[in-house]
Structures are given as C-alpha cells and as structure tokens.
C-alpha cells in the first residue's frame, strides 16, 4: 500500500513554492508520492479567468519531471463543471482502493474548511494534511495532520503579474516552466 498525498490547485503557473511545499509534506508525512492534481474549475474561484487547462498541465509536467516522487493526476480534468473535493476523492478511492490517500491543503484553505461541500463525509474518506503558513490561523476542530514549510512568499498571481509587466521570474518558477510560458506567450498583457 502506497501513501499518496493529493495536492490540488490551479497551478497557473506552477511555481517553486508549490514544489517546496510538496517536497516538505512528502518527507514530513512519510509519504511515498505526491500527486499534483490540476483543478478544472475550483468552486471557490468560478468567476476567475484561467489559462487553458492544456497549458497548465504541460507546465505542471515540466515543473515536476525532475522528482520521481512527484506524479500528475488528471482526474479533475476528465470532468466538466466545478471540481468538488468530495466527488474527486470518492472517485480516487474507487480507482486506488489499496492506497492510503492524504489531501494536502494550505493554511488559507484550513480557514475555509467549514464551507467545503460534504465536509463531514469527506473527512471519513481521507486524511487532510494542513500546511502551516505565517499570517493564517490554523487551529481547527477537524482532525488534520500538519506540516511546517519554510516561508517562501510567492504566488501564481504574482508570477502572472511579473510576466505581464516584464519583471524577472528567476528562482520563482522552474526554468523549464519559464521557457514554456515565454514560448507560448502566456500571461502577456
């Protein structure tokens, strides 16, 4: 039985903060693999614009290819409409009944947990791992495991803005992702 961390996100674009967080959780929680799972449409972000899913998946492949413990899980890309974690986890549990799944969430999502769709049922299906982050309240009545990750203030929004304003993104995103963004004209004004 493998212990697998599911790391969902828009990854628009994937950045070194995502990779650092995944690597820290991998080792602190004693997991065998981290599966990066790009969202189709997160319910809490339905009114935002996203880069085409094809490009987000390609960038993610480039970002994780150097770590053999990092895999890509596209279950949410197979479905139309909003991506609810409960539906996704139910499907993954059916597909991988012999593996132990953990769902990784950032400190911002810990605060949002009470609003999650079918949360009580979800907590019976999967163990959550909360990633601590400065400035966010991580106390919760829910049974979460926690991981400490070194502070690395970077966000996909900031990186998109840097590309639009032609500011450097060195050391914020993997070089192969940067090259892909530039070659495909993503995030231009």
Curated annotation (Swiss-Prot):
Alphabetically ordered keywords of this record: ATP-binding, NAD, Nucleotide-binding, Nucleotidyltransferase, Pyridine nucleotide biosynthesis, Transferase
The protein's enzyme class: transferase
Segments forming a coiled coil: none
Origin superkingdom: Bacteria
Pfam families: CTP_transf_like (PF01467)
Pathway info: Cofactor biosynthesis; NAD(+) biosynthesis; deamido-NAD(+) from nicotinate D-ribonucleotide: step 1/1
SUPFAM superfamilies: Nucleotidylyl transferase
Catalytic activity: nicotinate beta-D-ribonucleotide + ATP + H(+) = deamido-NAD(+) + diphosphate
One biological process term in Gene Ontology: NAD biosynthetic process
Gene3D superfamilies associated with the record: HUPs
EC number: 2.7.7.18
Molecular function via GO: ATP binding; nicotinate-nucleotide adenylyltransferase activity
InterPro entries, per the entry: Cyt_trans-like, NadD/NMNAT, Rossmann-like_a/b/a_fold
Family membership noted in the UniProt record: Belongs to the NadD family.
Quaternary state and interactors: Homodimer.
Cited PANTHER family: NICOTINATE-NUCLEOTIDE ADENYLYLTRANSFERASE-RELATED, PHOSPHOPANTETHEINE ADENYLYLTRANSFERASE
Job description of the protein: Catalyzes the reversible adenylation of nicotinate mononucleotide (NaMN) to nicotinic acid adenine dinucleotide (NaAD).
Name under which the protein is recorded: Nicotinate-nucleotide adenylyltransferase
Lineage of producing organism: Bacteria, Bacillati, Bacillota, Bacilli, Bacillales
Gene name per UniProt: nadD
């Amino acid at each position: 039985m493998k212990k697998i961390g599911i790391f969902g996100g828009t990854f628009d674009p994937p950045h070194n903060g995502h990779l650092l967080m995944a690597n820290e959780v991998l080792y602190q929680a004693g997991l065998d693999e981290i599966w990066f799972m790009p969202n189709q449409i997160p319910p809490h972000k339905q009114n935002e614009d996203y880069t085409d899913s094809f490009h987000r998946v390609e960038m993610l492949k480039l970002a994780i290819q150097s770590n053999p413990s990092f895999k890509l899980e596209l279950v949410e890309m197979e479905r139309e409409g909003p991506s609810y974690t409960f539906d996704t986890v139910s499907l993954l549990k059916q597909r991988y009944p012999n593996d132990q799944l953990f769902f990784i969430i950032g400190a911002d999502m810990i605060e949002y947990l009470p609003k999650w769709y079918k949360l009580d049922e979800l907590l019976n299906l999967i163990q959550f791992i909360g990633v601590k982050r400065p400035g966010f309240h991580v106390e919760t009545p829910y049974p979460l495991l926690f991981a400490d990750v070194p502070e690395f203030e970077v966000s996909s929004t900031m990186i998109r803005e840097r590309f639009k304003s032609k500011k450097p993104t060195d050391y914020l995103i993997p070089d192969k992702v940067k090259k892909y963004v530039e070659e495909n004209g993503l995030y231009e004004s």
